A protein has these predicted regions:
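A short alpha/beta connector and helix-capping loop motif
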Residues: 19-37
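Metal-dependent phosphoesterase signature
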Residues: 66-88
Length: 149
């Protein structure tokens, strides 16, 4: 059996230029992933690898100005990037079989699930933990969101 890994995942996504132009069928879809970034940690939380790829958007090809300002990702950064199915397959291969995904906040996993469904892909994935929620509950002793800063 392969060694266990924690995959600390950070996604960036584009949104429609106008909320009224968001895709509504087969479900409301307003967050198209344009970057997957991750660190792999071993069982002792030592960094053992990193992964980063831009993703060429299919559904929202024009970059939302607010997204550009927040992420500093420009349209030209995405022009030669793989589309989501290839990028996600590469990411999952990099993750390996014996891992869990960790995020900081409640948004990344639902956005990832929506993108898998929009691309007609299998939405099965490793176990997932929202570290922000765990930190708030266990360390801060409340459910308020905490910034990493």
């Amino acid at each position: 059996m392969a060694d266990f890994s924690y995959i600390v995942l950070d996604l960036e996504w584009n949104q429609p230029l106008n909320p009224d132009s968001a895709i509504r069928e087969p479900f409301f879809f307003d967050s198209e992933i344009i970057e997957i970034g991750a660190l792999r940690l071993d069982e002792r939380f030592r960094e053992t690898g990193s992964f980063k790829t831009f993703i060429r958007p299919r559904f929202y090809p024009h970059m939302n100005g607010d997204v550009v300002q927040l992420t500093k990702i420009r349209a030209q950064d995405l022009e030669k990037a793989p589309e989501f199915p290839r990028a996600y397959a590469d990411f999952m291969e990099w993750c390996g079989e014996n891992c869990c995904l960790c995020t900081w906040g409640p948004d990344d996993i639902p956005v990832l699930m929506d993108n898998l469904l929009m691309h007609g892909m299998d939405a099965e994935m490793p176990c997932c933990y929202d570290l922000q929620r765990i930190f708030g509950h266990e360390i801060m002793r409340d459910d308020r969101q905490c910034s990493l800063e």
